[in-house]
Amino acid sequence: RLLGVRLETVAIEAPFKGFLEALSPLFNGLEPGIAEENLQSRCRGALMMALSNKFGGLLLTTGNKSEYAVGYATIYGDMCGGFGPIKDLYKTEVQALCRWRNARSPAIPE
């Protein structure tokens, strides 16, 4: 509200379960791991892209330079989008930017 943006919640459980069901014959007997974790992120990315397409928006990626440097990002998941506004900032710089913004009036949660 303070940022002037609309906030909605879209559940990923149904598409995630659908993907798991489709993959279950191939994943049968294997321990859950990174594939399932990445699949959750990819479900979010697909849903966000659908909203972006439907309403004519540009989906922004959320990754920063620190995350990309250590591989802490999921292709077609949190890297899904048309522009990365914080892609060239290290995590410490993102945190400093949030503190600077909140000093004016709190809008970004710690």
PLM features per residue range, with description:
Residues 1-66, 98:
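ATP-dependent adenylation/nucleotidyltransferase module used to activate substrates
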